[in-house]
Amino acid sequence: MTSKRDILLFLALAIAWGTAFSAIEIGLESLPPILFAALRFDVAAVLFVAAVVALGLEWRPQTSGDWTAIAVAGVLLVGAHFAFLFVGQSYVSSAVAAIVTSLIPILTPPIALLVLPRYRVRAPAVVGLAVGLAGIVVIAVPGGSLDGHLVGVGFLLASVLVFVVGSVLLERTVRTLPMVSLQAWAMAVGAAILHGASALHPAESGVGLTLAPSALVALVYLGVVCTAGGFLAYFLLLERVGATEASLVNYAVPVVAAVVGWAALGETITLATIGGFALIVAGFALCKIDVLWRQVGPLVGYGPRRRPAAGRGVVVDGNQYLADDDTYGEYDTGESERITHGTGAD
């Protein structure tokens, strides 16, 4: 990620998803959490359906794989994930919610190991999982930034788990629908599920609610900027720089959320919050140590070297390099590289 356009796109995405947590915090002052999440995806679904129509994309599911993808994305990635996320954030600060959801790339490898037959987990990833979970413990213990609000952390962890399971299951589907069409379906199905869950919960009744202007602005901002704009920026970034570099946005988002929560909402950032986040970042680095080293190493003069091939090498000051179409051999991560670690959550 060296071009100015890629960096600006990365920053725009981090800001869109990072500020989402503050917008959720504002909206929760006037709206019950599950209803708020449902309304957010009402707005986003309308925008995505309009995009499908405007672009003339195929929207009708053609195969069983399409229907499976719609069900997985709608039920897990949108419905269950955001229900748990919004309920969890009603107990904790926006910064803590953002930090807990940054566990998604760390929890993906062990879940993928159970579901994807060719997926392999190496020892550093196991250590990374333990370190990342230790970060959650640091944040959640009484006397930390949550003041013992373990219920909120529990809901947030549930949101992370259903998102990871949904992402891995989606990886297994063979689908023909364009990504924008799939997103439109997922948001519409997810919104319907959220409305259903809200209707079944007595505390979620919208009868007699007074929607403050700030909550209305937060709702529109979440639907338009954070969801529609965020997904657009994410998939553009994914196409330009790949899944590994795009997934780093998960660790810029909590920084944005913490700064905005402190500046706009007066939230406190404690040493426990900072320490827990540092452990989660360290856990991510261990989970992705091969891929990160492959990309960062050459920039500092170290890192993996590609194996020489007879007749196709070039010697520069004693170092032999291969043609650009050669692979990294043992450093190729194979199946794991195709799993997208973007949360889209925020």
Predicted features and spans:
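Specific transmembrane alpha-helical segments of multi-pass solute transporters/efflux pumps
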Residues: 16, 20, 49-101, 107, ...
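C-terminal transmembrane-helix exit sites in multi-pass transporters
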Residues: 105-130, 255-274
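Helix-helix packing/entry segments at the starts of transmembrane helices
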Residues: 39, 97-103, 168-192, 223-263
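Membrane-interface interhelical linkers
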Residues: 1-12, 45-72, 90, 118-126, ...
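Transmembrane alpha-helices of multi-pass small-molecule transport proteins
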Residues: 30-80, 105-107, 111, 162-166, ...
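Hydrophobic transmembrane alpha-helices of multi-pass small-molecule transport proteins
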Residues: 121-142, 260, 272-291
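Structural signature of hydrophobic alpha-helical transmembrane segments
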Residues: 31-46, 87-106, 149-163, 212-227, ...
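Hydrophobic/aromatic residues within transmembrane alpha-helices
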Residues: 27, 36, 40, 88, ...
